[in-house]
Amino acid sequence: MNQEKVLKTLLMPIVSEKMTMLSANNQYAFKVRMDSSKREIKAAVEILLGVNVENVTTLIVKGKKKIFKGRTGSRPNWKKAMVKVSAGQIIDVNRT
């Protein structure tokens, strides 16, 4: 896999109350590029964070409709990847 693509696949970890509860089950969420596949996401997490990935689930989050100065607009769609790592391994999202 192209090294540059690996570095650009993961955009940021998602830190929320729901994701904090899921981290007890070895699941973590990341905002990823829209054109990333599950194989690319798995490879990027394993290379960059040094953990073994068991499963990757992806979903598209639709952008919200917003009104700004009387005009209707929308925020862009984005892709979320939920990654399950092997038992006993953790990802420190504060460090990433």
UniProtKB/Swiss-Prot annotation:
Annotated family: Belongs to the universal ribosomal protein uL23 family.
Give a short account of what the protein does: One of the early assembly proteins it binds 23S rRNA. One of the proteins that surrounds the polypeptide exit tunnel on the outside of the ribosome. Forms the main docking site for trigger factor binding to the ribosome.
HAMAP family assigned: Ribosomal_uL23_B (MF_01369_B)
One example of the protein's molecular function in GO is: rRNA binding
Q: Which UniProt keywords apply?
A: Ribonucleoprotein, Ribosomal protein, RNA-binding, rRNA-binding
NCBIfam families in UniProt? PRK05738.1-3, PRK05738.2-4
**Which example biological process does GO assign this protein?**
translation
One family from Pfam that matches here is Ribosomal_L23
| Gene behind the chain | rplW
Which domain of life does the protein's organism represent?
Bacteria
Output this protein's name: Large ribosomal subunit protein uL23
Q: Does the keyword RNA-binding apply?
A: yes
Q: What's the subunit arrangement here?
A: Part of the 50S ribosomal subunit. Contacts protein L29, and trigger factor when it is bound to the ribosome.
The record's GO CC annotations read: ribonucleoprotein complex; ribosome
